[in-house]
Amino acid sequence: EMLRSLVGSEMCIRDSHVNEAPHFFQPKNKDKVCIFYSASGSWTPYYCVGLLTADANANLLDPASWKKHPTPVFQQKPENEVFGPGGSSFVSSPDGKECYMLYHARQIPNDAPGAMDSRTPRLQKIEWDKDGMPILGIPQKEGEPMAKPSGSPIN
């Protein structure tokens, strides 16, 4: 209900009335809290990740405490064959020095035949801005090599 009152017209953009999969996240900046959520319908080309932030000491039950990021913070990247990224959650590296976003996406457009059966899980390292807030980056192409997470056992 709080997200509905915050996003208003986002609920109706492009005939999709869905905001789902909220994930509460404490950034490095302990003065803030975040809620990442998936916006738009997963069957549309516009499925993406949105962000709400609030001061950590605010009344988090008051919709006025929350600020909505004006644009999606993570969205499709057709040139990387990433469509409909959403369902984000966050995990730390084994030693806690790095943070990764776990999400799902498709290699084909969401409105293509067979798209609804083609989601795959993805893992991508996030960075931090100068204020300690997360930067999710650009969705990487499936199968792109990445460095082992910090603290991973050597094999």
What are these regions (language model features)?
Residues T44-D55, P109-L123:
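Structural motif
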